[in-house]
Amino acid sequence: LLYVVDLNKEVSDFERVSLSGYVPENIKSKGIEILNKLAKEIPQEIKINTSIEIGFPTEVIVEKAKNENYDIIVMGSRGLGKIKSIFMGSVSQYVLKYAHCPVLIVR
């Protein structure tokens, strides 16, 4: 399970300059909470690893999947709608296009 901290959304420009690889505790706690909640929904016989990364979610997901030789990427979709997705793009669309492995998008 992977939680990507998108610092562009989580912190101001001033904070971003001073962070340089550091994840503020409140953001890290939020990620851990989300990962733990998701991990409880996965059957115990399935081995999982959890990870919190920093960066652009699109690039982090694709690179991590490639570097760790993922068999499949399963991810959610925010459902931006047709108009918003045209202007804002979509993490799931990017991953679907650039991932080296199959991608399953769940609504």
Q: Can you name each region flagged by the protein language model?
A:
Residues 19-33:
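A short acidic, glycine-rich active-site loop
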Residues 2, 49-53, 104:
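General small-molecule cofactor/ligand-binding pocket signal
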Residues 8-9, 60, 82:
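Generic structural signal for helix capping and beta-alpha/helix-loop junctions
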Residues 1-18, 41:
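Small/aliphatic-rich secondary-structure junction motif
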Residues 40-73:
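Structural beta-alpha unit
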Residues 36, 40, 93:
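Active-site phosphate/pyrophosphate- and oxyanion-stabilizing loops and adjacent acidic/basic residues
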